[in-house]
Every structure is written in structure tokens, then in C-alpha cells.
Amino acid sequence: MKSGRFIGVMSGTSLDGVDVVLATIDEHRVAQLASLSWPIPVSLKQAVLDICQGQQLTLSQFGQLDTQLGRLFADAVNALLKEQNLQARDIVAIGCHGQTVWHEPTGVAPHTLQIGDNNQIVARTGITVVGDFRRRDIALGGQGAPLVPAFHHALLAHPTERRMVLNIGGIANLSLLIPGQLVGGYDTGPGNMLMDAWIWRQAGKPYDKDAEWARAGKVILPLLQNMLSDPYFSQPAPKSTGREYFNYGWLERHLRHFPGVDPRDVQATLAELTAVTISEQVLLSGGCERLMVCGGGSRNPLLMARLAVLLLGTEVTTTDAVGISGDDMEALAFAWLAWRTLAGLPGNLPSVTGASQETVLGAIFPANS
């Protein structure tokens, strides 16, 4: 069974940077050693945003974007190696999620698409890459997401305490770690995605630092109720979603009914939308004693405060409190999934994704020996 140093690479729906994590992994433990966040050039970020909202690209443009993202991921890995004074031979493999540009797990031909050419990463780092983690699960009738609950269960489950892990990235997803029950998990809806999109359009800022804009505004209750009527929120699990659904166009359609509103009030309402949709799903799933939050949203003081109010009786904390950086959780999970793939172990949980069976995930892109 392969063990040693692994690198996880994650570029999520928030598009706030490429997260790269170095860890030692074996069958008994996962120990994080180092991490860094690598910036995404504005031009690349905009190209991904455009394609996620349905902008048409030529095959040439699509191929160029795939290559550019692969090179970006390789640059991020090489920066971490240099920082840690490590060579390619010191790393067993890289687990690279890729950049999701479309996720449509239902319909006549279910599919999900993550780009960022893994061949570019192998060629530029000299390290074996495991990628394309989601499509096998979809081929077996699953949602292909979320995949991180399996990792949360391995690291954070407790024999007697009802726990849930909440990742607030662009999309928010919940892992249900309830003693005596199968692991559950699904996407609750938008996390930071709509908040980030709004403040970017209105103020040219990538995100609402310390929730300053949202805290300066007031929740527009009719707008909140209008957004909460979206059918996704009442859809039963298993379910997953992404930027192709909850995007700026979605927000604009709801705002048409509310002309002339204060932009800060919209920001406050979007924060409340995220908090309410998460808390409702926690309660519908039976509640928990401890909710451990990770992802960029765990650094949003307004979101954390609202979750504590909406979930009275639940200890709301970050995963940092149990020794796992909330900023690095997803990248660490894909390093772990790469380890499982190389070990021939399944990486999905049918109780989460709805797949017909457990399966080894991903494709292996071997480096030259």
C-alpha cells in the first residue's frame, strides 16, 4: 500500500486561489506538513466564470483554457516544493481535483467536467498525478459529489457525538457524521458564490472581507423569501449543484422584482440566504451536537454568528479547533483520495452520492520512472 508524502491541489467554485497542501498519508493517519494558496490570474478567473455561465467557446479556446489551468496547477505545486526544499522524487503523487466548469449529474446523459490538463502537471512537476475523481461515481448513477464526506468521516467522526462538517466554499456542503448511521452528505446550496459575485460586480472586490458590506446592510425579507422558493432547496438528497446553476444570472432574475435596492442590503440578504439554507438542512437532518465549519466561509464572522443563532444548542466551531485548517480541508481531502486510488481503495460513499456501489475513483497519470 502506497504511503508517504502526497500533495493535494484544489481550485474550487469560489475561484479565490489554488490551494496546495503537502501531507504524509498512510492507512492510520493523515498529517498535514505545509500549504500555500496560489493566485489565479484575473483573465483565467474570468474565463472560467464565463464558461460556467454558459458562454460559448470554440474548441480551440476551450483547449487553451484546459492547458493554461494545468500549467497554473503545476506552478502552484512547484512553488510549494521549492518552499519546502523538496524534489519530485520526495512525493508519491499529486491529487488534483481540477477546475469544475460544469456539473449536471441528472438528465439523459449525466456529466461533470473538471479541466486543467493533468498531463501538463506531470510534465512540469515530474510527479504522478491522480485526477478526474468525479466521473466514475456519475457513471455508476451517483451525483459525483460531494466526495469530501468520506474524508470527513475518516478524520472527524466520533463514536458517540452527533457531528456534522460544513464546508462553505462557493457552494456549501454538509457531511453528516451520526453514530450508528451511514455517512450522509450533500450540497445545501450557495455558500460564498453569490456574495462574492455581487460584491465583485458592485464594488470590484473579490469578496466581502470580514463581512463589512453585509454587516452595513439590512436583510430584504421579500427578496430572501423569493430566493428561498427555488426548488433546489426543497429537493431531497442525494443532490449536488454548482456555479452553472447558482450564478450571477440566477441572482439577477430574482433582483428584477426589487429595483433600486441598496447594494449592501443585497449583500446582507445573500449572507442570510446562505445561513438559512444551511441551518434548515442541519435541522432537517436531525441536528447535531457539534457543527465543524471549514472553507472560506468559516472566516466570515457574520455567517458564523448567524449559524450560531439559527442553531441554538449546537456548538458551532471551525475545524481549526480540532487541528485541521479550514482553508486546507478540501485540498487535503484530494491528497487522501489520491492515496486511496493508488492503494486500490474506494473513494466514494453511495450513501452520500447515490451511486450503485463503492468504487475506486480517478484516473492515474504516471510520471516517468
Curated annotation (Swiss-Prot):
Provide the binding site for ATP: 12-19
Q: Name one GO molecular function term.
A: phosphotransferase activity, alcohol group as acceptor
Biological or metabolic pathway of the protein: Amino-sugar metabolism; 1,6-anhydro-N-acetylmuramate degradation; Cell wall biogenesis; peptidoglycan recycling
Q: What class of enzyme is it?
A: transferase
Q: Which UniProt keywords apply?
A: ATP-binding, Carbohydrate metabolism, Kinase, Nucleotide-binding, Transferase
UniProt keyword Endoplasmic reticulum present: no
Q: What is its EC number?
A: 2.7.1.170
Biological-process GO terms, alphabetical: 1,6-anhydro-N-acetyl-beta-muramic acid catabolic process; amino sugar metabolic process; peptidoglycan turnover
Please give the catalytic activity noted in the UniProt record. Answer: 1,6-anhydro-N-acetyl-beta-muramate + ATP + H2O = N-acetyl-D-muramate 6-phosphate + ADP + H(+)
Reply yes or no: does the keyword Kinase apply: yes
Purpose: Catalyzes the specific phosphorylation of 1,6-anhydro-N-acetylmuramic acid (anhMurNAc) with the simultaneous cleavage of the 1,6-anhydro ring, generating MurNAc-6-P. Is required for the utilization of anhMurNAc either imported from the medium or derived from its own cell wall murein, and thus plays a role in cell wall recycling.
Which family is annotated?
Answer: Belongs to the anhydro-N-acetylmuramic acid kinase family.
Give the NCBIfam families listed for this entry.
Answer: PRK09585.1-1 (NF007138), PRK09585.1-3 (NF007139), PRK09585.3-2 (NF007148)
This chain belongs to which protein, by name? Anhydro-N-acetylmuramic acid kinase
Chain's gene name: anmK
